[in-house]
Design a protein with these regions (language model features):
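Phosphate/nucleotide-binding beta-alpha loop and adjacent structural elements of enzyme active sites
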Residues: 1-246
Length: 246
């Protein structure tokens, strides 16, 4: 889970979150890779309360961000967080998926653990997680989203969508075939938090087959009790056009 928002102060009902932490290792890696870029196009899928999009908009001043957050409560908080950035950000109430259409968002008692997948073995989570009633939300594929916004290429794709990352990558078949996404920063899971959930190895195989290389694993989290077991991390993959620069 992206530390940029996981470590933010608790949010009171109806109030925007406190500003996120200073750049961590994951963001610094991206800042180094794009140090000379005058402007960036970014898609933030799983925007939660808007903290990650806020970091991109703050630390990449020339960037424009499309942020997706399907949960209505999270979306409302993200609106407040991102309001100061005006038309540099488009916040949309959408889930990123393999195809366009309506999908069921499985909600939980932890606002950062909602998923398109059913809850699995939550023993690997930090605290007890209860399943709530699902809600129907609209979904879009990345290929469709970018085409609709006139984006032929994308500099950064960030995803924190709780086990549905491989589904979303399958919905980016055209972009990935053209290696048109420069950098992909995403949460990767090593343990089955959700049913039928792909792991890091599935995602790495999918991206490696399309020419992407692993830049690194950041913010690795071990099991709270058995520290020998890796639960999740944030991974960065880069397209061939960036591999000589990273």
């Amino acid at each position: 889970m992206f530390r940029w928002w996981k470590t933010a102060a608790p949010v009171a009902a109806g109030q925007p979150p406190a500003p996120a932490d200073a750049p961590d290792d994951l963001l610094l890696a991206q800042l180094r890779i794009f140090a000379t870029a005058p402007s960036l196009s970014v898609v933030d899928a799983g925007a939660h309360h808007g903290q990650t999009a806020e970091q991109y908009l703050t630390h990449f001043p020339g960037s424009r961000v499309i942020a997706l957050e399907p949960d209505p409560e999270n979306f409302g908080i993200a609106q407040q967080t991102l309001a100061p950035f005006g038309d540099r950000v488009a916040l949309l109430p959408l889930a990123l998926a393999e195809t366009d259409g309506s999908v069921s968002l499985r909600r939980t008692s932890h606002s950062g653990a909602h998923s398109l997948l059913e809850v699995g073995d939550m023993r690997y989570y930090d605290a007890p997680v209860e399943t709530l009633a699902p809600v129907e939300v609209r979904a879009v594929s990345l290929d469709s989203l970018c085409a609709g916004h006139g984006l032929d290429r994308l500099d950064i794709l960030k995803m924190d969508i709780q086990g549905a990352e491989l589904l979303a990558l399958r919905g980016a078949a055209d972009l990935l075939a053209r290696q048109a996404i420069g950098l992909i920063a995403l949460e990767v899971l090593f343990q089955p938090l959700y049913r039928d959930q792909p792991t890091f190895w599935d995602i790495a195989d999918h991206l490696r087959a399309r020419g992407y290389a692993l830049q690194g694993l950041h913010d690795q989290r071990q099991h709270a009790v058995n520290h020998a077991v890796l639960r999740w991390a944030d991974a960065v993959f880069v397209a061939p056009r960036l591999q000589a620069l990273s």
